[in-house]
Amino acid sequence: MANVTLFDQTGKQAGEVVLNDAIFGIEPNQAVVFDVIISQRASLRQGTHAVKNRSAVSGGGRKPWRQKGTGRARQGSIRSPQWRGGGVVFGPTPRSYAYKLPQKVRRLALKSVYSEKVAENKFVAVNSLEFTAPKTAEFAKVLAALSIDSKVLVILEEGNEFAALSARNIPGVKVATATTASVLDIANADKLLVTQAAISKIEEVLA
């Protein structure tokens, strides 16, 4: 079992938290992490690209000239693909790029990125993040006390609305819960700031 220093909101040590090695101490599988990140990035694509094919382009209903006798190549419509202003052949149409990977693959990827952050000492555990009201300045003080000045993913327990609202307007800070933190978000973050309750939930979900 890996031990991680537990801090409070003021940056002082408040003990240690024991992490489950089956989740936070495995050998990262980079191939699986790569596959899941590609999948999650694909699902973020809007897929709203569209062009007009020859049936959608305005005009072109009349044959431009008669079939025979002009000496010119036969044409059926001025909106054929070879014409300027004609329809596009096999152009992109709106579609979803999302695809699913097996649950075992996604869970292994989560365990891999969590383990990597712990191994690189980029996993900061805090006993709680309690605020009486949404205060961005107060959350900024917490980050400063914990010496976090880079891209950070804050992983909270469910229902901690004040902490989530306090953090979301700070540049470089992204907020998620133990059940919504994605492999892409975790991999992109320079550090993870995780509450003790969120750690317990992560271990419950991925056990």
UniProtKB/Swiss-Prot annotation:
Oligomeric form and interacting partners: Part of the 50S ribosomal subunit.
Protein name: Large ribosomal subunit protein uL4
Organism ancestry: Bacteria, Bacillati, Bacillota, Bacilli, Lactobacillales
HAMAP family reported for this sequence: Ribosomal_uL4_B
Matches recorded under InterPro entries: Ribosomal_uL4, Ribosomal_uL4-like, Ribosomal_uL4_dom_sf
Keywords: Ribonucleoprotein, Ribosomal protein, RNA-binding, rRNA-binding
Stretches for region Disordered: 49-78
GO cellular component, one term: ribonucleoprotein complex
GO MF terms, alphabetically ordered: rRNA binding; structural constituent of ribosome
Pfam families, alphabetized: Ribosomal_L4
Cross-referenced SUPFAM superfamilies: Ribosomal protein L4 (SSF52166)
Domain of life the protein comes from: Bacteria
Gene3D superfamilies assigned to the protein according to its UniProt record, in alphabetical order: 3.40.1370.10
Task of the protein: One of the primary rRNA binding proteins, this protein initially binds near the 5'-end of the 23S rRNA. It is important during the early stages of 50S assembly. It makes multiple contacts with different domains of the 23S rRNA in the assembled 50S subunit and ribosome. Forms part of the polypeptide exit tunnel.
Any GO BP annotation: translation
Record family assignment: Belongs to the universal ribosomal protein uL4 family.
